[in-house]
């Protein structure tokens, strides 16, 4: 593929054999007009839909380049035994309790339509679909072992929401020694200022906190 600048001094080469694309939480509850966040909370999907179009292009580009694709879903068991007290209270205090009844089923509960990936994204059999209970995709999952087994040490990260699961996963990947890129226009949030603030944090400090690119910069 090609060499991309990760900081003012360091570079790394993206090669399809050791690179994976992570598409984070493109679920109906977050991205569908009848999903929990839009229908029940009244959040605008304008920025999510804009990012979705770019994400679909990025997935197609990754397939063309034979890059491993990982789709993640924030999800919980129906009995909520995998929900920590901390997360339970945080979501409850934000008036978005995990398991709350929504138009597409219980919010972020496995087996309900709202928890599933949006129809526009159709995983192939060779793709990995990863259920996770926390914001970082590495917490309480086998993701790190999976990447080691596949000899994957470069990640291209996109998805929703920028400031939450995307940023948490991106920062965690760097702490684990991965070379990771966040594709900023392939990430979405419900508020443009919050999205941009997350991007600005990553691009501050001369690359110490990571690197973002646009989709055009990546594929060109």
What is the predicted role of each segment?
Residues 24-28, 73-74:
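Short loop/turn segments at strand-loop or loop-helix junctions that form parts
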Residues 17-19, 34-62, 66-68:
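A short alpha/beta connector and helix-capping loop motif
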Residues 77-81:
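Short catalytic/ligand-binding loop motif for oxyanion handling, primarily in non-cytosolic enzymes
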Residues 67-74, 183:
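Short beta-strand segments at enzyme active-site cores
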Residues 1-22, 29-30, 57, 61-65, ...:
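Active-site-adjacent betaalpha module
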Residues 26-31, 36:
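Short connector loops/turns at beta-strand edges and beta->alpha or beta->beta junctions
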């Amino acid at each position: 593929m090609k060499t991309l600048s990760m900081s003012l001094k360091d570079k790394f080469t993206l090669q399809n054999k050791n690179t994976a694309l992570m598409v984070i939480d493109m679920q109906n509850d977050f991205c569908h007009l009848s999903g929990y966040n839009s229908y029940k909370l009244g959040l605008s999907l304008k920025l999510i839909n804009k990012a979705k179009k770019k994400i679909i292009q990025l997935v197609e580009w990754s397939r063309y380049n034979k890059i491993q694709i990982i789709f993640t879903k924030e999800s919980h068991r129906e009995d909520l035994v995998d929900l920590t007290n901390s997360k339970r209270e945080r979501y409850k205090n934000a008036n978005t309790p995990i398991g709350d009844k929504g138009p597409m089923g219980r919010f972020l509960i496995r087996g309900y339509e709202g928890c599933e990936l949006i129809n526009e994204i159709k995983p192939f059999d060779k793709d990995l679909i990863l259920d996770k209970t926390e914001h970082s995709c590495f917490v309480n999952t086998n993701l790190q072992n999976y990447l080691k087994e596949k000899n994957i040490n470069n990640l291209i990260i996109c998805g929703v929401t920028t400031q939450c699961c995307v940023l948490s996963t991106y920062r965690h990947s760097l702490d684990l020694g991965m070379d990771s890129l966040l594709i900023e226009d392939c990430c979405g949030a419900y508020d443009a200022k919050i999205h941009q603030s997350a991007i600005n944090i990553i691009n501050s400090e001369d690359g110490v906190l990571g690197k973002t690119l646009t989709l055009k910069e990546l594929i060109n």
